[in-house]
């Protein structure tokens, strides 16, 4: 179905799905400036935090940041896949990411081995390894505390790691607690994502359509309507567009317009009312 849909509308890829190519991601000036600041701070290590409500663009920011870091010489990026792990599993995952064999039931041995690997990497490349936590609000306190000690050296005067934390608004709230304040106070770079303006939402949508290969897929009126109803949330905008494109393909429509929007979304409340 997806291949047929792409051929029907002359699209290189589905523009409204999360797995769009990296070049299709829209970069605002604020995001670009943040990415450059993080790039410049990699050599020194430390902590970076990206926060925002669901749908404001945290995953996009992480994808773009990883792409830029992957382009830097000798930078090794590891991504924590299970942020809810307890300390023992956290050590196992970090060991796997950085190629450090760990022995079970020997946390101190793992502590020393991982720090030795990071120290060796720094001495040979002059660059800190990078560890990324998505959904970082799910990380338990004991792992956060262990991470803070694991990543620092020489009485906290040196950082062995660049840590990138991304999460919703619960993350900064947790880092203000008395137990986690020592970690929260170490955050050097912050990006707070909020609801996007109408101009940013429209620019994002137009960039997606142009990059996908069909800038004329939607009428200008429909774009404006979608932006208004998405209330600054990129995920809502993509879901609205995805549904319209699927219905248009099913009906054999050559273009998406306001009439289609009204047919699809204005009918929903009426159906719900009839069921009641």
Q: Locations of the language-model features?
A:
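Walker A/P-loop nucleotide-binding motif
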Residues: 44-64
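C-terminal alpha-helical "lid" subdomain
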Residues: 3-5, 160, 182, 199, ...
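Conserved Walker B catalytic segment
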Residues: 47, 116-119, 123-165, 178
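Conserved AAA+ ATPase "SRH/arginine-finger" region at the nucleotide-binding site
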Residues: 81-83, 175, 188-200
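Conserved NTP-binding/hydrolysis module of P-loop NTPases
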Residues: 11-18, 85-104
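A short, basic N-terminal segment
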Residues: 1-44, 266, 270-276
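Short regulatory helix/loop adjacent to the ATP-binding pocket of P-loop NTPases
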Residues: 66, 171-186
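Short conserved motifs of the RecA-like P-loop NTPase core
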Residues: 108-116, 128, 204, 216-229
């Amino acid at each position: 179905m997806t291949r047929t849909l792409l051929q029907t509308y002359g699209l290189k890829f589905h523009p409204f799905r999360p797995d769009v190519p990296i070049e299709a991601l829209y970069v605002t000036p604020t995001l670009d400036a943040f990415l450059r600041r993080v790039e410049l701070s990699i050599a020194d290590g430390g902590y970076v935090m990206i926060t925002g409500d669901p749908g404001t663009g945290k995953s996009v920011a992480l994808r773009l940041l990883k792409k830029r870091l992957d382009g830097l010489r000798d930078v090794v990026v590891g991504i924590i896949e299970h942020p809810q792990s307890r300390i023992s599993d956290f050590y196992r995952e970090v060991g796997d990411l950085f190629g450090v064999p760990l022995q079970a039931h020997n946390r101190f041995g793992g502590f020393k081995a991982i720090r030795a690997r990071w120290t060796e990497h720094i001495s040979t490349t002059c660059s800190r390894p990078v560890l990324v936590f998505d959904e970082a609000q799910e990380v338990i306190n004991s792992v956060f505390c262990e991470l803070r000690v694991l990543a620092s050296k020489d009485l906290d005067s040196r950082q062995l790691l660049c840590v990138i934390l991304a999460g919703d608004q619960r993350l900064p709230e947790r880092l203000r607690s008395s137990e986690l304040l020592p970690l929260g106070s170490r955050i050097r770079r912050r990006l707070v994502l909020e609801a996007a303006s109408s101009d940013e939402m429209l620019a994002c949508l137009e960039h997606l359509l142009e990059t996908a290969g069909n800038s004329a897929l939607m009428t200008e009126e429909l774009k404006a309507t979608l932006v208004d109803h998405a209330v600054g949330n990129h995920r809502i905008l993509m879901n609205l567009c995805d549904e319209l494109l699927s219905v248009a393909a099913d009906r054999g429509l050559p273009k998406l317009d306001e009439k289609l929007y009204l047919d699809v979304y204005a009918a929903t409340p009426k159906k719900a009312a009839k069921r009641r």
